[in-house]
A protein has these predicted regions:
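Short, Lys/Arg-enriched N-terminal segments with co-localized hydrophobic residues
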Residues: 1-9
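Active-site-adjacent loop/helix segments that line or gate small-molecule/cofactor pockets in enzymes
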Residues: 11-50, 189
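Generic structural signal for well-ordered, non-membrane alpha-helical segments
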Residues: 14-18, 22, 49, 80, ...
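Short, hydrophobic/aliphatic alpha-helical segments
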Residues: 16-24, 55-62, 112-113
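Active-site and channel-lining beta-strand-loop segments
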Residues: 45-66
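Glycine-rich loop-to-alpha-helix module at the N-terminal edge of alpha/beta enzyme cores
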Residues: 63-144, 148
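PLP-dependent aspartate aminotransferase-fold enzymes
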Residues: 109-215
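Condensing-enzyme catalytic core of the thiolase-fold
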Residues: 217-220
């Protein structure tokens, strides 16, 4: 949960209201937030009041430039009138259904036209779910359970991807580095399927694929 915001007003800011709200919230929400990534510390966690385009404002009135973009979905910025209008039109026809609509096909066609390798498109509600499905498809197609992750990558919060490795202390002569779960409650057996390779190390990736090609079914 590294902070990725730039405070516009570089003078010392006050987050008194956020601190007060945090003291209430921790009695109802774990860590006072709805995701561990939103927790910055007992005295540093802030709460948003409103946002527009690339700026957010906390409940103390501090303004920030936001580089997180809600972890991706708000690439066009907050309160973009085009997106908001499309959302309103979607609500007018009923919102979300347990059935398909014609628009799904139209959007899938647009995606395939922009990404020609995406011959078929399946939508998901989150990146976590998309990665879970991708791993499942990879296993089903390759008949292999093993998969590779790149050090420092983020693939959501399912048990399959909550793994890391200390590459600073790793000596390639000692074999593959031991992977460690990044959260309590992750079954250790899952780690037997995971291989992590350093970022931007094509040689190491090639070595792993040559060595474990009979085990690896998916590369994230």
């Amino acid at each position: 949960h590294k902070r990725k915001f730039l405070v516009l007003n570089m003078t010392k800011r006050s987050i008194k209201k956020s601190n007060q709200h945090f003291q209430k919230a921790i009695h109802q929400l774990p860590l006072g937030v709805t995701s561990n990534f939103r927790y910055w510390g007992d005295e540093e966690t802030i709460y948003v009041d409103r946002a527009s385009r690339c700026r957010i404002q906390d409940i103390d009135g501090n303004e920030y430039i936001d580089y997180r973009l809600a972890y991706g979905p708000y690439i066009l910025g907050y309160a973009d009138p085009r997106v908001d209008q499309a959302a309103r039109e979607g609500m007018d026809i009923g919102g979300v259904f347990a059935l398909s609509t014609e628009l799904e096909y139209e959007v899938a066609q647009m995606i395939s036209s922009m990404v020609p390798s995406a011959e078929l498109v399946r939508f998901s509600n989150s990146g976590t779910e998309a990665v879970m499905a991708a791993l499942r498809v990879g296993r089903a197609y390759s008949k292999r359970d093993g998969y590779i992750m790149i050090e420092g990558g983020y693939h959501g919060v399912s048990d399959s991807v909550l793994w890391d490795v200390d590459l600073d202390e790793w000596d390639p002569k000692q074999g593959d580095p031991k992977v460690q779960p990044t959260s309590h409650g992750v079954p250790s057996r899952i780690g037997e399927m995971v291989t992590l390779v350093p970022m931007n190390d094509a040689d190491r990736l090639e070595d792993v694929l040559k060595k474990k090609h009979n085990e690896i079914g998916t590369l994230l």
